[in-house]
């Protein structure tokens, strides 16, 4: 995991509202390496989903760069170049109920990408590819002629995964793909994603708020707070040695299966004033140890190092 697939440099996504400008994503910089899963966590409204949508060009970025294989995602592109980019980068959406067209059969939903990119030369080849994708995600080829309302939430999300895989992408953004599913189904979907990653060499940006599941699937984890990345580290390192107070507060909220311990456990609350900024001082995203980055002051950086 030394070759960079994606480079995000000072990404900003601001929205103008009648009450003022909302800085949903505010000066974000990080890299994603080929073959890895980068988890992105934070509370609702922190900007993690907006980050994913900005990376894949569903939103035009206010400022900053997103480089995919060295090429600027938000730069001007010909239709041919745009099609090439869209084929290499796909998204699995959060809501398996709203993200599938209820008027289309499963075959047409999955094959839509095949049709756009002209990847199937004949109807027979098209249907054969649909059947292969259905079986890849654990469904039957008999499901091809059914409609989304005939499936459970977990099955619909598998259809969404099959749709994303149809064009053989390199990079998939999974925007809270399990949050709308029952707990019993969540592990099945995550295990499926891990298996597909091994088979096809996929790279994931896995966006979620379930910290235990993020640790299970991710190689590295980034923590977002109010549009900013406050900590980024390998998954085990982040859980064993969290440095930013906000990360500590998130981890303290994870319930543990020990009633006696939970009864006496004190949850940590994050207070931004704890950083004690001096006049004119700003928080910076610094590398405190190899691969472990924290948003901190100069004094905190010295203490962490």
From Swiss-Prot:
It is an enzyme of class 7 (translocase). GO terms for molecular function: ATP binding; ATP hydrolysis activity. Keywords: ATP-binding, Cell membrane, Competence, Membrane, Nucleotide-binding, Peptide transport, Protein transport, Sporulation, Translocase, Transport. CDD domains: ABC_NikE_OppD_transporters. It comes from the Bacteria. GO terms for biological process: establishment of competence for transformation; peptide transport; protein transport; sporulation resulting in formation of a cellular spore; transmembrane transport. It catalyses: a [peptide](out) + ATP + H2O = a [peptide](in) + ADP + phosphate + H(+). It is a peripheral membrane protein. Belongs to the ABC transporter superfamily. PANTHER family: D,D-DIPEPTIDE TRANSPORT ATP-BINDING PROTEIN DDPF-RELATED (PTHR43776:SF7), TRANSPORT ATP-BINDING PROTEIN (PTHR43776). Part of the ABC transporter complex OppABCDF involved in the uptake of oligopeptides. Probably responsible for energy coupling to the transport system. Required for genetic competence but not for peptide transport or for sporulation. This is Oligopeptide transport ATP-binding protein OppF.
